Amino acid sequence: MEQCYNRGCGQLFDPQTNNDESCRHHPGEPFFHDAYKGWSCCNKKSVDFTEFLNIKGCTLAKHSNVKPPEPEKPVKDESDKDEVIEVRAPIREALPRPPIDSPLTVIQPTVAPALKDMVFAVKTPAAQKSSDAIEVGTTCKNNGCTYSFTGNSSDFGECTYHPGVPIFHEGMKFWSCCQKRTSDFSQFMAQKGCTYGEHKWVKENDDKKVVQCRYDWHQTATNVVMAIYAKKYDYSQSVIELNPIRLHVNLVFPEQDNARFDLDLELRGIVNVSNASAHMYGTKVEIKLPKLEPGSWSNLNFPNKKLPVVKKSQVEEKKKQEESDEEFFDLDDIKAETSFRLSEMSMQSPNNLD
């Protein structure tokens, strides 16, 4: 008796009685996939190994005492064993750089309460100190205000005035800051101001002093954060302007005769202006510049570059364009028929005017 080596048979057979229908076996290969066990020659499969071994063969043939050849194992190629595969990140195409003279957008900062208290404490003594040099009867320099200096505490009260300029056009007289128009000069002069603020007893000096402030910056994956270290600056007069590649900061220091710190930078990268923000604290100004494209900045700005003159914001440009055809006048240069200056015109009780 000889052993049959056909897959799925495993019986002993007599070579003398061996014929074409003696052996029921599986001519295919066994396979194991996803917990299933089966044969490649038929569709029978099972998850149980015992059931898999008991699956009857699907083909009849003679018994064979020859072992079937083992399936060839794939030859392991070790020729690339020491090869180093370098994976590089895909190169992103850089965004086009906007023009440096693109319109600047004014960033409205969040002001800390401590800074507001500090500025108020600085401005109040300065106003009281300047009152010693103001003569009684001096008219407020704000347009539209007829209040005269009396030397009392009420001189530092609320002022109602026009921040704009007078315009005379096609027989109409009005202020650039509001929409009220009239053809009568007396009504124009008596028109109540549209803005509330403080009285101005002395004209501002155009010769501004310069202050040097230290600034620094750091960056994250999505933002560049800049800090300007300054104290006792007036948040209401200071300006932060930005376009995609340019930052302009102007800080005013009332305690130093309105000296200014002016910083104008061409930024190294491109920023998202709409998401930019600023915070004003008692010891610094912090500006957050969101990156418009991923990547690290090698520096904050391009040093030693001469930048074009700062443009006004789009709103100011539009307003300027609308008023470009109008005629502007300085009220101090206009004389009435009675030969007295309009800025000095007052009634018997000027402080009682509405």
Swiss-Prot record:
Molecular functions per Gene Ontology: zinc ion binding
Post-translational modification Phosphoserine, affected residues: S324, S339
Residues noted as binding Zn(2+) 1 in the record, renumbered to the chain: C4, C9, C23, H63
Subcellular location as annotated: Cytoplasm; Nucleus; Cytoplasm, Cytoskeleton, Spindle
CHORD domain boundaries: 4-63, 140-199
A Pfam entry, by short name: CS
Residues involved in Zn(2+) 4 binding: H162, C177, C178, C194
GO cellular component, one term: mitotic spindle microtubule
Residue stretches making up the CS domain: 210-301
Annotated GO biological process: centrosome duplication; positive regulation of microtubule polymerization; regulation of cell size; regulation of dendrite development; regulation of mitotic spindle assembly
Record: residues binding Zn(2+) 2: H26, C41, C42, C58
Keywords of the record: Cytoplasm, Cytoskeleton, Metal-binding, Nucleus, Phosphoprotein, Repeat, Zinc
Disulfide bonds: none
Protease is among the record's keywords: no
Entry binding sites for Zn(2+) 3: C140, C145, C159, H199
Transmembrane stretches, start-end: none
PROSITE patterns to which the protein is assigned, alphabetical: CHORD, CS
InterPro entries named in the record: CHORD_dom, CHRD1, CS_dom, HSP20-like_chaperone
Disrupted-gene phenotype: Results in centrosome amplification and lethality. Cells become polyploid or undergo apoptosis. Homozygotes died as third instar larvae. RNAi-mediated knockdown in neuronal cells, results in severe mitotic defects in the larval brain and is lethal at the third-instar stage. RNAi-mediated knockdown in the female germline, results in embryos failing to hatch due to various mitotic defects such as abnormal chromosome condensation and adherent spindle formation. However, in contrast to RNAi-mediated knockdown in the brain, embryos do not exhibit centrosome amplification.
Top-level lineage group: Eukaryota
Gene3D superfamilies, per database record: 2.60.40.790, 4.10.1130.20
Subunit text: Interacts with Hsp83.
Annotated function: Regulates centrosome duplication and mitotic spindle dynamics. Also involved in controlling the size of dendritic arbors. May act as co-chaperone for Hsp83. During mitotic spindle assembly, regulates microtubule (MT) dynamics by binding to MTs and promoting MT polymerisation. Promotes the elongation and retraction of terminal branches in response to changes in body size, possibly acting downstream of the TORC2 pathway to enable proportional scaling of dendritic arbors.
Name the UniProt record assigns to this protein: Cysteine and histidine-rich domain-containing protein morgana
Species of origin: Drosophila melanogaster
